[in-house]
């Protein structure tokens, strides 16, 4: 008879502990998933905004040469090999020259149109390898610059590896906080259960 309260106490504590661990796992998964989705949406929105700003900052001269001095308002586009780049290249006959950010110290190839086709708005996105080994998210668009049907290809590239590092750092911090909270909750539950079942031992 004396063993019964102890067995009951163990089972109740074990059940509450398993439930607390399961709840923490669900909360961790839910929060990290929502954070990743929000971060990726914000990242894509930023690249899209930079792309439209770039398109609005470039023109073509009378002899068909690309002109402009785009300023996207982000210092990372001026830091060499930062993982944040932009470029403007001719995409039709009669257009010459090219523009690129000072951060882009080398060429970054783009996939063929067959491999990654443009959508109905003449835009496409893909992942590429950066100049420093980072992964890049690339937003690309072809745009008609004037009435002469002169077309240029605009690309804005963001450091996707940097985004993944930020998400991983958030996940580590969240895991630490939830672990501390979980251990505290389990300890409090155990103490409460032991105290609550004490009358059964008499």
Q: Each PLM stretch: what is its role?
A:
Residues 56-57, 65-133:
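Extracytoplasmic ligand-binding sensor domains of the Cache superfamily
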Residues 1-41, 146-202:
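Alpha-helical transmembrane segments of membrane proteins, especially the N-terminal anchoring helices
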Residues 36, 44, 78, 85-87, ...:
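Compositionally biased, intrinsically disordered low-complexity regions enriched in proline and serine
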Residues 48-55, 132-139, 197:
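Conserved long hydrophobic alpha-helices within structured protein cores
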Residues 52, 64, 71, 83, ...:
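General N-terminal targeting signals
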Residues 103-176:
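Extracytoplasmic
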Residues 2-92, 165:
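Juxtamembrane segments flanking the first transmembrane helix
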């Amino acid at each position: 008879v004396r063993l019964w309260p102890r067995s009951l106490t163990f089972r109740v504590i074990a059940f509450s502990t398993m439930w607390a661990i399961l709840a923490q796992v669900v909360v961790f998964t839910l929060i990290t998933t929502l954070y990743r989705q929000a971060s990726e949406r914000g990242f894509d929105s930023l690249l899209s905004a930079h792309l439209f700003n770039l398109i609005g900052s470039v023109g073509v001269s009378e002899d068909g040469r690309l002109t402009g001095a785009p300023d996207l308002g982000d210092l990372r586009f001026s830091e060499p090999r930062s993982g944040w780049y932009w470029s403007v290249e001719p995409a039709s006959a009669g257009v010459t020259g090219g523009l690129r950010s000072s951060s882009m110290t080398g060429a970054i190839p783009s996939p063929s149109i067959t491999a990654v086709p443009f959508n109905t708005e003449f835009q496409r996105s893909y992942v590429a390898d950066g100049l420093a080994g980072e992964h890049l998210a690339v937003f690309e668009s072809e745009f008609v610059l004037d009435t002469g049907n002169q077309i240029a290809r605009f690309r804005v590239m963001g450091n996707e590896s940097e985004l993944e590092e930020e998400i991983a750092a958030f996940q580590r911090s969240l895991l630490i906080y939830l672990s501390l909270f979980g251990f505290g909750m389990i300890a409090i539950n155990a103490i409460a259960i032991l105290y609550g079942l004490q009358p059964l031992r008499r």
